Amino acid sequence: MNSLQILSFVGFTLLVAVITWWKVRKTDTGSQQGYFLAGRSLKAPVIAASLMLTNLSTEQLVGLSGQAYKSGMSVMGWEVTSAVTLIFLALIFLPRYLKRGIATIPDFLEERYDKTTRIIIDFCFLIATGVCFLPIVLYSGALALNSLFHVGESLQISHGAAIWLLVILLGLAGILYAVIGGLRAMAVADSINGIGLVIGGLMVPVFGLIAMGKGSFMQGIEQLTTVHAEKLNSIGGPTDPLPIGAAFTGLILVNTFYWCTNQGIVQRTLASKSLAEGQKGALLTAVLKMLDPLVLVLPGLIAFHLYQDLPKADMAYPTLVNNVLPVPMVGFFGAVLFGAVISTFNGFLNSASTLFSMGIYRRIINQNAEPQQLVTVGRKFGFFIAIVSVLVAPWIANAPQGLYSWMKQLNGIYNVPLVTIIIMGFFFPRIPALAAKVAMGIGIISYITINYLVKFDFHFLYVLACTFCINVVVMLVIGFIKPRATPFTFKDAFAVDMKPWKNVKIASIGILFAMIGVYAGLAEFGGYGTRWLAMISYFIAAVVIVYLIFDSWRHRHDPAVTFTPDGKDSL
């Protein structure tokens, strides 16, 4: 463990902590709105930064680079296709959520269906968070940090003991941010760490390409695009970890769950100052997601060129970072990875606290709980679920098929059934609560049966697409046989300004064509004749960008409108 590495790691970590404390020292975290929703005050850049850093963590940095090391660029679909579902969030989901002024997704489910449906979803999310998602985040973070700093060797302890130690330290740091500071503290820390992640994340492939080119960046690019160039192909084949058919069927559903219904993510946009700010934040995130392959996938391809004999593919990213970055930068990037882990961990920890206190506790245990009591209970539950995650994390030592794919398969047990009942609840106002309960049960049972018990030779994303179709049919049939007595309607709670961003649809079109351009451009390396499609797509995206810049400049002096909770706006 090098002293310069430690100094740069501690220095950047302390800088983030001090700035976060300074920014939130006068923020109200004792109230329900202040702690759980940051007082509904977040603007688009902060929302996008917070969404990105909550999403980008070591399970992706390690897991996706590992998949790219084995299979190539086609795994970028996990990230790039998120642009489609972030457009869904901006145009379909967020307007409905903010109109009702909800604090959690189960709030909507209770209003749309009934209390029992809400409680079922609360328990599903809390169980998945505590025993599946957060342990994987902690374990992958500990694995990466141990590889970077050789903690086990430095302290003369075993690899397993080093993982336990790092998991505990990461868990404690996450508790401090989430349980003590609430969502505002996380959003501020995310913004700072986001800058570091962009800088550090881009430095890894840059120095990696220089290493590939034996000191020349351009020769590194030439080697990447000429030697094993087929690894750059964006179109996944039937035997790849992400076949192209699965990317635009089951994966769209998985990403819709993640970006549009997952409490840990959506809570960032529920805290937006207005619908327009939330939409801008969601679409800005969509743009950033299309740049993710540079940070998450390209390092795996570079590692393939440099180290073709790694014992485990998930070692590709930390090995590359440790070998190509200058010594002080390893410490800095270790601090950035630390911040990314903490952001994801405390983001979902805060959401779990919200769901338990405002859902289960207030509805089952103490229906007369005061707002301050809900905050206290939420903090205590956050501490509890953090301890559970810390205890489970080190046991994920030998995840089959790599960390990333394994995590996605486990989450598939409940995520697509949840997406189904929310979408059907939006567009079919007569579907009753019974349909939601039956669909959740059938969706979970059918997925477990097809994917785990009966060994069909199907990619799990195709299985999810099938379960979605089954759930839709089940809900439509029940809705036809036993419809709601009265159709459900969305009523405005006047929680935030509901005026949409006027350019949201134009920006969405530009993002879609940019995504098509990314796929088409890289498909050339697989022998597909997609050059003209890529050029046309890039041109349309560029026109949209120019229009948005011009429109923003033209209206730069327009007076701001102040929103008031009574539904009347004023200048």
From Swiss-Prot:
Keywords: Cell inner membrane, Cell membrane, Ion transport, Membrane, Sodium, Sodium transport, Symport, Transmembrane, Transmembrane helix, Transport. InterPro entries: Na/Glc_symporter_sf, Na/solute_symporter, Na/solute_symporter_CS. Residues 1-3, 96-118, 184-191, 262-283, 346-380, 437, 482-505, 554-571 are cytoplasmic. Pfam families: SSF. Residues 25-74, 140-162, 213-240, 305-324, 402-415, 459-460, 527-532 are periplasmic. GO terms for molecular function: D-glucose:sodium symporter activity. It is found in: Cell inner membrane. GO terms for cellular component: plasma membrane. The chain crosses the membrane at residues 4-24, 75-95, 119-139, 163-183, 192-212, 241-261, 284-304, 325-345, 381-401, 416-436, 438-458, 461-481, 506-526, 533-553. It is a multi-pass membrane protein. The keyword Transmembrane helix applies. The keyword Lipid metabolism does not apply. Belongs to the sodium:solute symporter (SSF) (TC 2.A.21) family. This is Uncharacterized symporter YidK. The gene is yidK.
